[in-house]
Structure formats: C-alpha cells, structure tokens
Amino acid sequence: MTNNLSGYRNKFVRVKTSKKRTVSSSNWLRRQLNDPYVAKARIDGFRSRAAYKLLEIHEKFKLFIPNMKIVDLGAAPGGWSQVASKLIKASDNNLNNKIISIDVLEIEHVAGVEFVQKDFFEADTEELIIQALDGRADIVMSDMASNTIGHKATDHIRTLLLCEQAFEFALKVLKPSGHFIAKIFRGGAENELLHKVKREFKTVKHFKPSSSRSESTEIYLVALNKK
C-alpha cells in the first residue's frame, strides 16, 4: 500500500536558523527533512512525494488501465507522469499508450511520455497538446497549484483559477466517459466550479490522500465519466 511508511520515519531533524533563509523557507526545509513520503519517494525512485497522492487516487477509483491517452498539466518534476507511465505500462515503443506532459519547467524523460515545455496559459498551448494527442484523451490530470503566499484565501482563489482552466481544457479534449483529476484548496469559493463539473461528469468526488499533509487544505477533485 502507498501509505505504508514503515522504515521511512527518521529521527526529527531540526533546521538551524540562518540570516539568508526566510521563516517560510526554513519551515519548508524542516517539513521536507522530516517528511516520510519524501524519504520514501527517494527510495522508490519517484521525483516527488506527490506521486503517492496519484497512486492513492488510483487505488481508490481504479482509473488507469493500459492503452490510454493521458494529459498531465503542470507536470514538473514528473512524479505524476511517472505514476501514470507505470500504471498504463507505457513505453517509448508502445504507440497505444500516450502521455502528454506539459510544464514551463523542463523535466527529465519518462518512458512513454511526450513532454511539451510551454506555459499552459499561452495562447497556442492548447492546440499543441491537441495535436500531440492525435485524438481524444482518456484522462486529464492536474496537480497545478499557484505559488503560495501563506494567505489562505488568496492561495485558495489562485489555485482554484488554475483548476478552472484545467477543467475548461479537459472538456475540449476528453472523450465521452473520460476522467478529470485536479487539485483544489478548500476555502468556500470552489462550490461554483463544483456545480459546473457535476453538470459535465456523471460522478464527482472529493478525495484527500493520506499522503497529503494533514495541515494542508488541499483536496483532489475526481470527476468520472464525462457525459
């Protein structure tokens, strides 16, 4: 199971204060050093702890099967693309599987993944992804989040806007019965988006993986079977 952390919990590491390091960066470093999922990801060969969130989503909803076309929005550093590649048994020589990953930041090659290095919000990006897909997608997934500033309401709205953009794109490229997965932060303003999603998908669920930090307001919107 992805939440089995036996052997990954280390002795608590304290982070010394530094004049060059802000309080927020010190807190982030402390969390990273003491996070068992970070240690587990390093050992398991995943590029980020976020890989376990997608694994848990799959364990719950059984979304990924071989011979799929998948779009991974905001893919860097590639943890979700790695998981999708493993679950659908993708390879560079298997044309029946296709994963299109996009991010403004470069990511190292993942087997069976075609990487598009562009800003998702640039005018021509959607058309580039559609051309690369060469058909309709089975899954559109987004772990995109805005750079947080520590103000919960602002962070909530900014990440919600990213989710809305991903949702609008998903409607354009998903095949009937396709699925949409996206991160949102709880904060109250998400209800309008949820109503829109429910009109377009047969089943819409909220899911908070155990690998999501307990103090975080993040949850995942899992929309199943596009109408």
UniProtKB/Swiss-Prot annotation:
Gene3D superfamilies: Vaccinia Virus protein VP39. The active site is at K183. It is found in: Cytoplasm. GO terms for cellular component: cytoplasm. It catalyses: uridine(2552) in 23S rRNA + S-adenosyl-L-methionine = 2'-O-methyluridine(2552) in 23S rRNA + S-adenosyl-L-homocysteine + H(+). Keywords: Cytoplasm, Methyltransferase, rRNA processing, S-adenosyl-L-methionine, Transferase. GO terms for molecular function: rRNA (uridine-2'-O-)-methyltransferase activity. S-adenosyl-L-methionine binds at G78, W80, D103, D119, D143. Its EC number is 2.1.1.166. Its main location: cytoplasm. The keyword Phosphoprotein does not apply. The keyword rRNA-binding does not apply. InterPro entries: RNA_methyltr_RlmE, RNA_MeTrfase_FtsJ_dom, rRNA-MeTfrase_E, SAM-dependent_MTases_sf. Pfam families: FtsJ. SUPFAM superfamilies: S-adenosyl-L-methionine-dependent methyltransferases (SSF53335). Coiled coil: none annotated. Specifically methylates the uridine in position 2552 of 23S rRNA at the 2'-O position of the ribose in the fully assembled 50S ribosomal subunit. Belongs to the class I-like SAM-binding methyltransferase superfamily. RNA methyltransferase RlmE family. This is Ribosomal RNA large subunit methyltransferase E. It comes from Rickettsia peacockii (strain Rustic). The gene is rlmE.
